[in-house]
From Swiss-Prot:
Protein localization: Cell inner membrane
Full protein name: Fluoride-specific ion channel FluC
GO CC terms in record: plasma membrane
Function noted in UniProt: Fluoride-specific ion channel. Important for reducing fluoride concentration in the cell, thus reducing its toxicity.
Membrane topology of this protein: Multi-pass membrane protein
Family that this chain belongs to: Belongs to the fluoride channel Fluc/FEX (TC 1.A.43) family.
Transmembrane portions of the chain: 21-41, 52-72, 83-103
GO biological process annotation, one example: monoatomic ion transmembrane transport
Reaction(s) catalysed by this chain's protein: fluoride(in) = fluoride(out)
Keywords from the UniProt entry: Cell inner membrane, Cell membrane, Ion channel, Ion transport, Membrane, Transmembrane, Transmembrane helix, Transport
A Pfam family annotated for this UniProt entry: CRCB
UniProt feature coiled coil, ranges: none
């Protein structure tokens, strides 16, 4: 891995962290990240560009640990029904949004 490629991943991770700081909503962040992920994987871009966008930006932006912390906080408050619904809604919604991003990416040339 060359230094410029590594720097680009770090730059996109920094940008994602900056955006994540201002968007403190796990559902919104997950939806945006899933859409971007679906869009990028549908495009014919180089493997390096995909790694920069998906590893650098999407992975840092969506941060699975933020999602898990959100679910943990609901569970320790004893809201297990709410936990069940949030868990399922977030997963299903993100799959649908990722598929929509994929379809849109295929249509855009």
């Amino acid at each position: 891995m060359n230094k410029i490629f590594f720097f680009k991943i770090l730059l996109f991770a920094y940008l994602a962290s900056f955006l994540r700081f201002f968007l403190n909503n796990n559902l919104l962040v997950g939806v945006i990240g899933s859409f971007v992920y679906g869009f990028v994987i549908s495009r014919r871009v180089s493997k390096l560009k995909k790694e920069i966008l998906l590893t650098g930006f999407c992975s840092c932006f969506t941060s699975f640990s933020g999602f898990v912390l959100f679910l943990y906080e609901i569970s320790i408050q004893g809201y297990f029904l709410k936990l069940f619904f949030y868990l399922n809604i977030i997963i299903v919604l993100n799959l649908i949004i990722m598929y929509a991003g994929f379809l849109l990416g295929r249509k855009v040339t």
